[in-house]
Amino acid sequence: MKFDVVIIGGGLAGLTCGIMLQQKGKCCAIINNGQSAMNFSSGSMDLLSQLPNGEKINSFEQGYDSLEEQLPNHPYCLFGKQHVLQKAKQFEQLIEKINLNVTGSYKQNHFRVTPLGGLHRTWLSADCIPTMDLHDEHFGYQKITVLGIEGYHDFQPHLLAENLIQHPQFTHCSITTALLHLPELDQLRLTSREFRSVNISQLLEHRLAFRELVQEIKQASGDGEAIFLPACFGLDNQDFFNKLTLETGLNLYELPTLPPSLVGLRQHKKLKTYFEKLGGFILNGDKALRAVIEDQQVKQIYTQLHQEHGIFAEHFVLASGSFFSNGLVSVFDRLLEPIFDVDMIGNSMIDIQNRLTWTARRFSSPQPYQSAGVAINSCCQLKKSGQIIKNLYAAGNVIGGYNALELGCGSGVAVVTALTVADNIIEAQNRV
């Protein structure tokens, strides 16, 4: 098989890059091994939430200079402020076209309510999630009802309510909790392993008398002005939840549950469907194993399902994710990228070849290994033994030099690098 571009990884970075390339007339294939991190995500995307010194960030433009000073190896610092802002704006335009149902702007972060009742700075959020402006002194409603589902332990209304009321923006609120019984779920309640958001959503969409669900939500909501629900209403898209909102006449909001996250699943499905609609190929259930590199170029790769006959392409994109997705792995004496074994980078706290530096003593502290990843140049090209591989690029969390969890920038790095890679591939092919 031969394509213009082969992308390893079907997450946010891989799909974003693939969509942009398909729009420019390139023939792309995505090698997708299992679920992406989007299926476990909150439904929100971060551009930059805080600096390495712990300072919270209201806007990327405000925080960039300090980021460049404190962490010059961050991928953003390779591109420059204006390039990152341009790509963030471009991504917003892309997802508006796809109708991803998100709110927010690269110009300023906003708060989203977390499932545990926290307030998290973020860039873009699904429009079904409760959010508020950073400068709002009070949440927009005074009476909030948090509804759980009887027997469902992946969403805890009481815990959310007790934590939420601690924030100054919610001290004026009256927050009550209640449980929905939903008799149609009794079969799932018999097996706790099956009582998960995906299973609940499937049953509610296909077996439930919709009117009874509407009435139970209205009754349990009492005099609540804003109703917070676990994200269990609508598996493939937001239509079922939107219909619930319309029929109840209430201000309904969804909060992501413990994985799998339906909000993230919906976003991933929309991106994937759009990529395929543009003519892209997805090789599901396959895994890239090794590559043939000659004259500083990748000639072909072999996968689990294509071990005898390689997959050829003009350009290759590594968007396989970090340790969570097995895009990076560890052996006893070093951290490495397993397919191409390219050069790695971390931050000042870690030595890639000294495992004693990989972790911090406190479990809750930022872990140094999370900053490890592949080293790139300003074109997102990779290096092997110090030599640039001309047709191999990286996008997303496989890139090192920063801690996405600590800084709140994982999604931002994914889309900025993905769009940068797409531009560079198009430019390279136009030169030929």
Curated annotation (Swiss-Prot):
Keywords: Flavoprotein, FMN, Oxidoreductase
UniProt record, GO biological process: glycerol catabolic process
Listed EC numbers: 1.1.5.3
Entry GO MF terms: glycerol-3-phosphate dehydrogenase (quinone) activity
Enzymatic class: oxidoreductase
SUPFAM superfamilies found in the cross-reference section: FAD/NAD(P)-binding domain (SSF51905)
Cofactors: FMN
Reaction catalyzed: a quinone + sn-glycerol 3-phosphate = dihydroxyacetone phosphate + a quinol
Superkingdom assignment: Bacteria
Pathway involvement of the protein, from the record: Polyol metabolism; glycerol degradation via glycerol kinase pathway; glycerone phosphate from sn-glycerol 3-phosphate (anaerobic route): step 1/1
Function as written in the Swiss-Prot or TrEMBL entry: Conversion of glycerol 3-phosphate to dihydroxyacetone. Uses fumarate or nitrate as electron acceptor.
Alphabetized PANTHER family for the sequence: ANAEROBIC GLYCEROL-3-PHOSPHATE DEHYDROGENASE SUBUNIT B, FUMARATE REDUCTASE
HAMAP family in alphabetical order: Glycerol3P_GlpB
Name of the protein described by the UniProt record: Anaerobic glycerol-3-phosphate dehydrogenase subunit B
Source organism per UniProt: Histophilus somni (strain 129Pt) (Haemophilus somnus)
